[in-house]
């Protein structure tokens, strides 16, 4: 575990919640600039979702939803992670994703679900965000 103090170590990667509010694009750029190889976080198992949810509940200062690295670039419900990892696990909130008004193409953790479930959201909305890095 080479993660800095306030980062969550999990499966060889480190995760950190940032409380400043950014658009999805700005959040991804922030993670990338933080350290080469960093991205908005990706998830691949239920256990990871739970651990992250617990971590965010402990460290997130606001009530806002939290951006993760999933988006629908082609706008056709083909979801992709920014770290190019396999989209093998999805845990949507009820009746999501819905591309509401054909405007929602970025994915956030929903605070009302304890950060366990996902919603597609307008990418220009401002949320807190979760970076994932290797140290």
Curated annotation (Swiss-Prot):
Annotated disulfide bonds: 3-14, 31-131, 38-133, 106-123
Boundaries of every C-type lectin domain copy: 10-132
Galactose-binding, short sequence motif: residues: 96-98
Alphabetical list of InterPro entries matching this protein: C-type_lectin-like, C-type_lectin-like/link_sf, C-type_lectin/snaclec_domain, C-type_lectin_CS, CTDL_fold
Record has Glycosyltransferase as a keyword: no
Main location per the UniProt record: secreted
Tissue: Expressed by the venom gland.
Residues reported in the UniProt entry to bind Ca(2+): 96, 98, 104, 119-120
Subunit structure: Homodecamer of disulfide-linked dimers arranged in two pseudo-5-fold symmetric pentamers.
Family: Belongs to the true venom lectin family.
Protein name listed in UniProt: C-type lectin Cal
Organism: Crotalus atrox
């Amino acid at each position: 575990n080479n993660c800095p103090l306030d980062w969550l170590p999990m499966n060889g990667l480190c995760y950190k919640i940032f409380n400043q509010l950014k658009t999805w694009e700005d959040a991804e750029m922030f993670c990338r600039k933080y350290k080469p190889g960093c991205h908005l976080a990706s998830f691949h198992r239920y256990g990871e979702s739970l651990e992250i949810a617990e971590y965010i509940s402990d460290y997130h200062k606001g009530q806002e939803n939290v951006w993760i690295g999933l988006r629908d670039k082609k706008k056709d419900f083909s979801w992709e992670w920014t770290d190019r990892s396999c989209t093998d696990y999805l845990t949507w909130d009820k009746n999501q994703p819905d591309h509401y008004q054909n405007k929602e193409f970025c994915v956030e953790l929903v605070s009302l679900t304890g950060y366990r479930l996902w919603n597609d959201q307008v990418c220009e909305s401002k949320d807190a965000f979760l970076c994932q890095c290797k140290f």
